[in-house]
Curated annotation (Swiss-Prot):
Location of the protein in the cell: Nucleus, Nucleolus; Nucleus, Nucleoplasm
UniProt WD repeat ranges: 414-453, 457-497, 593-633, 634-673, 677-717, 733-763
Tree of life domain: Eukaryota
Organism: Botryotinia fuckeliana (strain B05.10)
Name this polypeptide is given: Ribosome biogenesis protein erb1
Family annotation (HAMAP family): BOP1
Cited InterPro entries: BOP1/Erb1, BOP1_N_dom, WD40/YVTN_repeat-like_dom_sf, WD40_repeat_CS, WD40_repeat_dom_sf, WD40_rpt
Keywords: Nucleus, Repeat, Ribosome biogenesis, rRNA processing, WD repeat
GO CC aspect terms: nucleoplasm; PeBoW complex; preribosome, large subunit precursor
Protein family according to the UniProt entry: Belongs to the WD repeat BOP1/ERB1 family.
GO molecular function: large ribosomal subunit rRNA binding; ribonucleoprotein complex binding
Quaternary data: Component of the NOP7 complex, composed of erb1, nop7 and ytm1. The complex is held together by erb1, which interacts with nop7 via its N-terminal domain and with ytm1 via a high-affinity interaction between the seven-bladed beta-propeller domains of the 2 proteins. The NOP7 complex associates with the 66S pre-ribosome.
Bias (Basic and acidic residues) ranges: 327-341
Amino acid sequence: MAPPTNQRKRKAVTRDEPEISDVESEAEFGDGILEGILSQSEDESDDSAAEEDSEDEEDLDEEELEALDSDEVPSENGEGEGSMTRTSLNKINADEDDDKPNYTVVKDANGGERYVYEEINPVYDSDDSDAQEPTNTIGNIPLSFYDSYPHIGYDINGKKIMRPAKGEALDALLDSIDIPKGWTGLTDPSTGKPLNLTQEELEVLRRIQTNEVPEDGYDPYPDYVPYFSGVEEIMPLSSAPEPKRRFLPSKHEAKRIMKIVRAIREGRILPYKPPQEREEEEEEHHYDIWQNEEAQPDHIMKIPAPKPPPPGYDLSYNPPPEYLPSKAERKEWEATDPEDREKEYLPTAYDSLRKVPGYDKFINERFERSLDLYLAPRVRKNRLNIDPASLLPKLPKPEELKPFPTVTQTLFRGHDGRVRSLAIDPSGTWLATGGDDGTVRVWELLTGKQLWSAQIGDEEAVNVVKWRPAKDAIILSAAAGDDIFLMVPTIIDPVAESNSRELLDAGFGYATNATQALTANGQKKEPVATWARPTSRLQDEGVLIKITVRSTVKVINWHRRGDFFSTVSPTAQKSAVAIHTLSKHLTQIPFRRLPGIAQTAQFHPSRPIFFVATQRTIRSYDLQKQELVKIIQPGARWISSFDIHPGGDNLIVGSYDRRLLWHDLDLSTRPYKTMRFHNKAIRAVKYHKGGLPLFADASDDGSLQIFHGKVVSDAMENATIVPVKVLKGHKVKSALGVMDLDWHPKEPWLVSAGADGTCRLWT
């Protein structure tokens, strides 16, 4: 009898697998532990395992069938062996049913093999018992589409999901009374069944309600684990002090932050915007409706409206008390007609700004403003747009205008009381001074040594000293009281002294032979001045002539040739100004009457013009034509002194009201320049006679102001005046400072006389 054949079909092997020897596998993979590692695909491993199982089963079946077909008689134990054989045979048949494959092999569209698996039928012992119920896979489609069908959708396999049965009203009432666990009262839209919560979802909701972490097993307070090892250390790991960088802000972080800040400022980093907003902004288009508008020029007759005046202090809600009207002023304002009122309002004070009421005349003011703009004509005033700095002359720097005196070179001490006057001789060697002590002193200019002195006034002070300008004879004139003294100091060389004495003595013979003037009655006129010799003591000291006039002499000025000199006696009336002739010993009164009190007089340096200054004006007279030439009006309240430029076309005036005035005689009778640099009265002014463009003034504030005055011959160019230096050294005593000054005839040196009894040489 042929052995029964096995009815199970073996799975065909699709490809041959190469045989790998044990030696090679051990050498290649080490220990060869490859449990769970698949050499090929899962399908191939399943096929190979199925083949091995089928071979073992075939071998077992053949052995069992041979045993059953044998004719041998069983032993005593044969019955047991037979039962055992039947049991094993039943087991084999059962295993055949269990080991039956769960798929079928079919041909696919390409002619290849395709495995179709059977549907799993889950039972209680199945591993798929926890699988969820079939879900509805209709997608995002409203369930109302299936209202007319018995099913509500399809599952993953395409089978219909039938509509669940609906409970009656009694069931709904029972469900609402006896609420099951997990009941929500909602219906699942995808299945149509009640939506209940699982135990896990209920636990999550409970944790959320109790402010706990929803995650199961999360410990918010775990046990602290030491940072290093958990072993307590006796010695510190590092005892180094804390570095300073831990207490200071990081420079590297500051650099990074500043880099980001610069990028934000430059626009390279922009704030985050959602893509939707960014797209909306890009889609938005903004159009400039005035983009193509061209600027049109205003009408030629258009004049802009004037701006309203800004409010003043009286319009404040809490103005100062002086702006608030009194009761009388308020009544007067209320009684005045509105048209006659100076202001349309009365200043009012309020404690705070919130208490200020509305302005009741706002509409009236706006209306009046509109009327003004509409009816009032407008006038355009053309203003010169000139830079004020361009109108100022460009003055040179004082350093470029040197030389001029800056420091004290020599100090002259010897007078008791004030030094009222001083003068430098034409050669620039000697300095003559006169003071309150009644003495005339002659000093050596460079060394400050006193060389000669004479006491000409017993009780009167020496008001003025002057040297004769000519160099053929050296004569010094001085005035003390109403006496004028002409003297020849004994310090000069014998030849010059002899010539000077002869010049003074020649006038006595002319005065003896001259006829005296008679009055209308035939009587002799009283002489204006008396020329005589002084006492023998004064003659021995060098004082040769004494001229007595009617009043105290304050000013002496010589003519450039040295034969005439003028004197001024402010207290006299008719004989205030006198002109003396040295060669004839003659004194003349040129003015019968002056319109004011004479202050000083001076000869023109090159022309026959005589200047006389009163308190407010300076008059110039032509001595040849004997007529008035010009009246100069400085505008000062009280003229103290004046001096004429060596060129003869300019004049400076000093006044007691602290003004220094420069006059251009060819330009105008008014001052060309007025300077106010002193705090007190100006006593004396003087030009430099040696060709240097310098002049100076002396003031009662104890200072001297040095100026650079450039005068050109071009009539189209004005004089340039630059203050260059302020000299301070004299002390102020009894409100008097510097009394007089004089320039060296050649050098830029200046000598000043002060009320402190000293003289100073400035170089």
